[in-house]
């Protein structure tokens, strides 16, 4: 019994997740009622991840900054640049693919209760207000912009504290990390529950009517994940990027695909960064920051659905307007985490560029909700895995630079 438990707790998490995935599909096909019931396992897993993620971010960032040594480099600027570059490039890819394979929408009735933001200024205003949120409210509502602001502020203040205080913060950081590891070990059960309940309750029948749109959306995301991102990483590290790309997709992307939450996947990404032996001072800040602003998947969703509406309505689009749409989609995507409903509710902003009435834009949003089972999952997988990928690329590039300058220097 003890050997079995040891095998379960120390075995390959990826293999266990794949077993959970297959088991979930089988249960959903054999007994939909049972599959709906085991959905509780998925809900518990996602709930546990969402519960521990805000505390993890607060404590890790605070500990990292409080113990930061003067002159020690954190690489946040290069990572931030990669985040913004990746998001804009993803929107550009979506524009090109949408022109190559234009989609038509069978527009459905909009949801009257949906309230999208009124403009880009409103989105940016929401992000700025998130910075000055009450710290307890930020933790409760998982407002990661607010959590990061308070963690950075407290960390800077605690730099001047005694060694005992710094030691206490470090111990808290280790304690929270241990809790996170325990939660992540439950991933196979969580994935099993999520897959089984999703297939049993939703199914994929509703998706067939939007097959071409889904192919364009998922195709763009695969193109970004397997071609564009590797090119960016190669430019940064100057060696074969695919081992790193596949490691991030396998260990971060798979979990994010089923949890459908970048915030819930933060602990998974933190653990992967540790496994990749990255600088903790860097990833403890860049991963929660990425979960907030690194939104390549959201940029693709906004662009593809907007251009599908434009094509359906027969509105002509020139090259400068298409480029402007890429910029607008990238800016909107960076604000997607601050909007309830995420990328879908920012589609009316982009539609507004082409003079599309709000009621028609909301019908496009409704189409987005119909295909959300796959769209949201793929979008989150791309967003979250890219957080780790770009963090690792920046860290490895910096390590290589230091090694070239001083071959005897060991980080």
UniProtKB/Swiss-Prot annotation:
Is Membrane given among the entry's keywords?
Answer: yes
Keyword list (alphabetical) reads: Amino-acid transport, Cell inner membrane, Cell membrane, Membrane, Symport, Transmembrane, Transmembrane helix, Transport
Entry's Gene Ontology cellular component terms: plasma membrane
Under Pfam families, the record lists:
SDF
Catalytic activity as recorded in UniProt: L-serine(in) + Na(+)(in) = L-serine(out) + Na(+)(out); L-threonine(in) + Na(+)(in) = L-threonine(out) + Na(+)(out)
Q: How does it sit in the membrane?
A: Multi-pass membrane protein
Q: Which InterPro entries match?
A: Na-dicarboxylate_symporter, Na:dicarbo_symporter_sf, Ser_Thr_transp_SstT
User: Which residue ranges run through the membrane?
Assistant: 17-37, 41-61, 79-99, 138-158, 189-209, 214-234, 295-315, 327-347
Principal localization reads membrane
Please provide, alphabetically and separated by semicolons, the GO molecular function terms listed in this UniProt record.
Answer: neutral L-amino acid:sodium symporter activity
Q: Where in the cell is it found?
A: Cell inner membrane
Q: HAMAP family this protein is in? A: Ser_Thr_transp_SstT (MF_01582)
Q: Which PANTHER family match?
A: PROTON/GLUTAMATE-ASPARTATE SYMPORTER (PTHR42865), SERINE_THREONINE TRANSPORTER SSTT (PTHR42865:SF8)
The family line of this record is: Belongs to the dicarboxylate/amino acid:cation symporter (DAACS) (TC 2.A.23) family.
Q: What is this protein called?
A: Serine/threonine transporter SstT
């Amino acid at each position: 019994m003890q050997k079995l438990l040891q095998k379960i707790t120390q075995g390959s998490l990826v293999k266990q997740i794949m077993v959970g995935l297959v088991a979930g599909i089988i249960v959903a096909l054999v007994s939909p009622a049972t599959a709906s019931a085991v959905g509780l396992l998925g809900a518990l897993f996602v709930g546990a991840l969402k519960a521990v993620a805000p505390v993890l971010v607060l404590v890790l960032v605070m500990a990292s900054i409080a113990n930061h040594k003067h002159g020690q480099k954190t690489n946040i600027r290069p990572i931030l640049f990669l985040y913004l570059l990746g998001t804009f490039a993803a929107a550009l890819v979506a524009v090109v693919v949408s022109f190559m394979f234009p989609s038509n929408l069978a527009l459905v009735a909009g949801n009257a209760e949906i309230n999208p933001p009124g403009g880009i200024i409103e989105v940016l205003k929401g992000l700025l207000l998130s910075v000055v949120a009450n710290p307890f409210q930020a933790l409760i509502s998982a407002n990661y912009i607010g959590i990061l602001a308070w963690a950075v502020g407290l960390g800077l203040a605690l730099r001047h504290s005694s060694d005992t205080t710094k030691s206490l913060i470090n111990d808290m950081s280790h304690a929270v990390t241990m809790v996170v590891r325990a939660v992540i070990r439950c991933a196979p059960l969580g994935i099993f529950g999520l897959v089984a309940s999703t297939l049993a309750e939703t199914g994929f029948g509703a998706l067939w009517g939007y097959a071409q749109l889904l192919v364009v959306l998922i195709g763009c995301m695969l193109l970004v994940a397997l071609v564009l991102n590797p090119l960016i990483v190669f430019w940064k590290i100057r060696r074969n990027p695919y081992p790193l790309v596949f490691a991030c997709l396998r260990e971060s992307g798979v979990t994010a695909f089923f949890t459908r939450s970048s915030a819930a996947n933060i602990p998974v990404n933190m653990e992967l960064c540790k496994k990749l032996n990255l600088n903790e001072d860097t990833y403890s800040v860049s991963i929660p920051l990425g979960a907030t602003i690194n939104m390549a998947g959201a940029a693709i969703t906004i662009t593809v659905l907007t251009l599908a509406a434009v094509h359906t309505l027969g509105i002509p689009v020139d090259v400068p307007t298409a480029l402007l749409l890429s910029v607008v989609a990238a800016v909107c995507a960076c604000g997607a985490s601050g909007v309830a409903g995420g990328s879908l509710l920012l589609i009316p902003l982009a539609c507004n560029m082409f003079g599309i009435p709000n009621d028609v834009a909301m019908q496009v949003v409704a189409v987005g909700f119909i295909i959300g089972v796959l769209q949201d999952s793929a979008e989150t997988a791309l967003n979250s895995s890219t957080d780790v990928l770009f963090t690792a690329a920046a860290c490895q590039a910096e390590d290589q630079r230091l090694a070239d300058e001083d071959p005897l220097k060991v980080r």
